[in-house]
């Protein structure tokens, strides 16, 4: 059975967090650290792609007062700058 996209994101994010923790400890041999770094970059791209996909979906149809449907861009409420 195929995994849900949210499961794929959560799994990739967990693996990425594990890799970051291992790299931050600084006790990996260089070759292993380089492989982990490469895998981390790949996972970061997967997560970024999933987040972009989610953002596109958040550009949901909003019903205006007149009953018309319109799209509205996603505006983060956190006050963080875009990409940050």
Curated annotation (Swiss-Prot):
Q: Which reaction does it catalyse?
A: Exonucleolytic cleavage in either 5'- to 3'- or 3'- to 5'-direction to yield nucleoside 5'-phosphates
Record-linked InterPro entries: Exonuc_VII_S, Exonuc_VII_ssu_sf
Q: Origin, by domain of life?
A: Bacteria
Please cite one Gene Ontology biological process associated with this protein: DNA catabolic process
> Which GO MF terms are attached to this record?
exodeoxyribonuclease VII activity
Sorted UniProt keywords: Cytoplasm, Exonuclease, Hydrolase, Nuclease
Please name the Gene3D superfamilies in this protein's record: Exonuclease VII, small subunit (1.10.287.1040)
Its annotated compartments are: Cytoplasm
**GO CC aspect terms:** cytosol; exodeoxyribonuclease VII complex
Enzyme class of the recorded protein, top EC level: hydrolase
Which parts of this chain are annotated as the region Disordered? 65-84
UniProt-listed Enzyme Commission number(s): 3.1.11.6
The protein's matches in Pfam families, at most eight in alphabetical order, are given as: Exonuc_VII_S
Signal peptide segment: none
Q: Main site of residence?
A: cytoplasm
Quaternary structure (record): Heterooligomer composed of large and small subunits.
Function, as annotated: Bidirectionally degrades single-stranded DNA into large acid-insoluble oligonucleotides, which are then degraded further into small acid-soluble oligonucleotides.
Stated family: Belongs to the XseB family.
Q: Which NCBIfam families match?
A: PRK00977.1-4 (NF002140), xseB (TIGR01280)
Q: What name appears for this protein in its UniProt entry?
A: Exodeoxyribonuclease 7 small subunit
